[in-house]
UniProtKB/Swiss-Prot annotation:
Family note: Belongs to the eukaryotic ribosomal protein eL20 family.
Subunit structure: Part of the 50S ribosomal subunit. Binds 23S rRNA.
InterPro entries in UniProt: Ribosomal_eL20, Ribosomal_eL20_dom
Statement: the UniProt record of this protein carries the keyword RNA-binding: yes
Keywords: Ribonucleoprotein, Ribosomal protein, RNA-binding, rRNA-binding
GO molecular function term, any single one: large ribosomal subunit rRNA binding
Gene3D superfamilies per the UniProt record, alphabetical: 3.10.20.10
Protein name as annotated: Large ribosomal subunit protein eL20
Superkingdom of origin: Archaea
GO cellular component: ribonucleoprotein complex; ribosome
């Protein structure tokens, strides 16, 4: 069964830390982390060592803030 995972963190190594929140609909928490590392690393050109995870939590469909993920969940 799929879970909705919210990852909060920051990217270090730049002039000032960039704070982010990402939400993923995945089967395992590890899948969400791997996708987040891949996306953030390619978009911001940082290595995984510079991405600091602050919080990883499972959330309900009502708590989703990402509009694209919200629309996707409404379809099913």
């Amino acid at each position: 069964m799929a879970k909705i995972i919210r990852i909060k963190g920051e990217i270090l190594g730049k002039d000032e830390p960039m704070v982010f929140t990402k939400e993923y609909n995945v089967v395992k928490e590890d899948d969400a982390l791997e996708t987040m590392y891949s996306e953030m690393g390619s978009k911001h050109a940082v290595k995984r060592a510079y991405i600091k995870i602050v919080e990883v939590s499972e959330i309900s469909e009502e708590d989703v803030q990402n509009p694209i993920l919200k629309k996707t969940l409404e379809m099913y």
